[in-house]
Amino acid sequence: MTKSVDDLARGDQAGDEQDPVHREQQTFGDNPLEVRDTDHYMHEYVGGFVDKWDDLIDWKKRYESEGSFFIDQLRARGVETVLDAAAGTGFHSVRLLEEGFETVSADGSPQMLAKAFSNGLAYNGHILRVVNADWRWLNRDVHGEYDAIICLGNSFTHLFSERDRRKTLAEFYAMLKHDGVLIIDQRNYDSILDTGFSSKHTYYYAGEDVSAEPDHIDDGLARFKYTFPDKSEFFLNMYPLRKDYMRRLMREVGFQRIDTYGDFQETYGEDEPDFYIHVAEKSYRTEDEFVDMYSNAVHTARDYYNSEDADNFYYHVWGGNDIHVGLYQTPQEDIATASERTVQRMAGKVDISPETRILDLGAGYGGAARYLARTYGCHVTCLNLSEVENQRNREITRAEGLEHLIEVTDGSFEDLPYQDNAFDVVWSQDSFLHSGDRSRVMEEVTRVLKPKGSVLFTDPMASDSAKKNELGPILDRLHLDSLGSPGFYRKELTRLGLQNIEFEDLSEYLPVHYGRVLEVLESRENELAGFIGEEYRAHMKTGLRNWVQAGNGGSLAWGIIHARA
């Protein structure tokens, strides 16, 4: 029998104090920190808490803080039908109806749905189509396919087991049309776990005189306390999802492109966002359409390196062959000579023969690939996202007669267009910093690596002891929210099963290199003015000085990382 909204509000047995829907007080047992169960949310969203929920959100301020972000995301994709899978008290469902979207409102809490229904009537008389549904059985409880599914309000973190998370994402995926989009948000648990809790209390929980702060945090539990003006307190036990883990789960379910925003911004450098919003597209692209799947960070890097100013700078100032940090015998040594010495140092760490197949990720102008092919007679595949650099690479390679050994491919190292177990060596120099998802890059690297193969790369990194505010100018310049670190790469490579992970710390060369590039740029200023814009040169000099300062101050690390499958 179909339940009415009043039935949902009362629960199956109205008046039964054991019914979590009817109960006014939460129950967490003798030890609340042991409560780490997906189904327990029913005992947390009790009537007394739900009645105060809108005081926490403050619909008016929430509307102002979000602006048109979600509406713009949906309209840009031609969305007409939306499933609001975590409707709560109805804020987004009402907003979507106001904007003309055909919307179904689902939630696992009957009390929340009853509140949402009454809120819909109160706001311009909207009659919400509400469905009491458990995400793990969403196809059973909710019918039809949708252009978009939204799961907002940090709701996904109520799922405590990975099995539940994967099943829920699979249900979302199945209920989307072939070109549908999933939008999920979450607290920035990375920041809370790594550096402690802080909140601007601006975008999501904007109610005045209401606080939402952690009562306990560990790797498996985020217990938040909500305090209201009448001194009443309620708690929610949630799983602290890390951003990259969440992105990985969505990819593994089948979502093709995932963009992550911080507090509704594409880039979120120095100031940590309170919340992340993941926008995941289901539409499948062929290899010829990979450019459409590039993440925002990759698009930013591609546009930069394809620009005329950047191409002229790296070709005429940096050397036009290698675009990476060099190993200098003297601070005034030629950049090209020092840069090739880095290639030689790296090549000496692995056995290379004519039968060796090497993948060079972020190959730039192909200097390393040509050195390896010329010296060892091996085959090198260059993958790089800048079509401008790739064209120069092909022309120089052809001029040197090495085109039979070197293949140049346009692409992103976040989605490698190669089969599993394809390469003996995966090589990269100072490129991974441009990715917004380095965990994904490491997964792709290990996927295409042959058994007993080697991963060999350098990357400008944050030192393991660096504080994020020390990196602000560098991150802002690169439009990134973070850098990798030696500890990060060691952890990721270990997670992926690689062994004998070594880091040759050559950090002292990083400020020397950027200082040398700055000297060359300044000494050739008049000559370069004809083909590199003044604004670009000014910004570049500022950026180079920031690299030198941070390198000398110990906030940056650089060196050769070598790991074996």
Swiss-Prot record:
The keyword S-adenosyl-L-methionine belongs to this UniProt entry's keyword annotation: yes
InterPro entries per record: Gly/Sar_N_MeTrfase, Methyltransf_11, Methyltransf_25, SAM-dependent_MTases_sf
GO BP term, example: glycine betaine biosynthetic process from glycine
Matches recorded under CDD domains: AdoMet_MTases
Catalytic activity, reaction form: glycine + 2 S-adenosyl-L-methionine = N,N-dimethylglycine + 2 S-adenosyl-L-homocysteine + 2 H(+); sarcosine + 2 S-adenosyl-L-methionine = glycine betaine + 2 S-adenosyl-L-homocysteine + 2 H(+); glycine + S-adenosyl-L-methionine = sarcosine + S-adenosyl-L-homocysteine + H(+); sarcosine + S-adenosyl-L-methionine = N,N-dimethylglycine + S-adenosyl-L-homocysteine + H(+)
UniProt feature, compositional bias: Basic and acidic residues: 1-10
Protein family according to the UniProt entry: Belongs to the class I-like SAM-binding methyltransferase superfamily. Glycine N-methyltransferase family.
Protein name, per record: Glycine/sarcosine/dimethylglycine N-methyltransferase
Species: Actinopolyspora halophila
